[in-house]
Amino acid sequence: MTIEALRTPDEAFTAVPDFDYPVHYADDLPGYEGLRAAWIDAGPADADRVFLCLHGEPSWSFLYRRMIPVFLESGARVVAPDLFGFGRSDKPVRQQDYSFDFHRNHLLRLVERLDLRNITLVVQDWGGLLGLTLPVDAGFAGRLSRLIVMNTGIGQGESPGAGFDAWKNYALSTPDLPVGRIIARGTPHLTEQEIAAYDAP
């Protein structure tokens, strides 16, 4: 099945500050053939440990720009994927293509592709909703060593709640979501250049 998607041009990322890390792409992850997945992969490929950094909504891997150097200084490898719909990854056009399983399975396929082991899973916001469920997958469980959990939770299978519904309604009613300004509300020390970087995708 082909999924129609949009792609942010590379030129949109030329002015992104403090984020000069190797970007990798794959358009052949099993189950996602034709969709381009993007991720940052920095540090030694043969490092004995890896930090896997999962961003939330509505950000992208740029969120980790200040943490990546700290992780790299420890001698570790750092992998920070952009979920589909965010950052440098393709953005499926149809709303129904976005589901929990769609995002979760993308992460599992990427971990398998890169054969990541001794993982410190770093999760924030929606990255936690997705990432904290990865260890129940038999193929992932033996790869995980540590967790860093920030500003997130894990669902209980009940209704999403008023806060989620309010966010969803806001996002659906806003034709051009001001991502940089949304992030800046909770992070008032951001520069205008950093705010623009959140808007880049």
Q: What spans do the regions from the language model cover?
A:
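Flexible "cap/lid" subdomain of the alpha/beta-hydrolase fold that forms the substrate-access gate
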Residues: T2-V23, A37-A45, V50, L63, ...
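Short phosphate-coordinating micro-motif centered on Lys-Gly-acidic
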Residues: A26
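Per-ARNT-Sim (PAS) sensory domains and their PAS-associated C-terminal
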Residues: G31-G34
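Structural cue for short, hydrophobic secondary-structure segments
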Residues: C53-G56, A80
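The serine-hydrolase catalytic nucleophile loop
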Residues: E57-I68
